Amino acid sequence: MSTYHPKSGDITRKWYVIDATDVVLGRLATHAADLLRGKGKPLYAPNVDCGDHVIVINADKVAVTSNKREREMRYRHSGYPGGLKSMTLGRSLDLHPERTIEDSIVGMMPHNKLTAASAKKLHVFSGSEHPYAAQKPEAYEIKKVAQ
């Protein structure tokens, strides 16, 4: 019996919506990255894009533990000499929470060409409204852990 390899036509993609209200940023990122890669599916293969679409709402209400809002730094570079820009995680979450959560989720995925295709299925919104109601997304609950 030969090993089964899924093809792109064999995969049925679901839509999930995650409410980020009071969810720790790292826990949210790992759950969303696993959904985007399709790690929970029986047809999972690391070389095939078999993940689902993920919608993250209330990105501006995500939780960050300890004093990481002031301690953690976010960096980006313009490509020009002296073009390194930095800001704290708290300032980044205040200015553009969607981009900060997208960067965190994509950072939890392997850095290859397949991740670029999987990241296109990630949709992050700072409010509770999203334009994907016609796809009938399922609510995905992230369990709270007592700390």
From Swiss-Prot:
GO terms for molecular function: mRNA binding; structural constituent of ribosome. SUPFAM superfamilies: Ribosomal protein L13. Keywords: Ribonucleoprotein, Ribosomal protein. Gene3D superfamilies: Ribosomal protein L13. Pfam families: Ribosomal_L13. Part of the 50S ribosomal subunit. Belongs to the universal ribosomal protein uL13 family. This protein is one of the early assembly proteins of the 50S ribosomal subunit, although it is not seen to bind rRNA by itself. It is important during the early stages of 50S assembly. This is Large ribosomal subunit protein uL13. The lineage of its organism: Bacteria, Bacillati, Actinomycetota, Actinomycetes, Mycobacteriales.
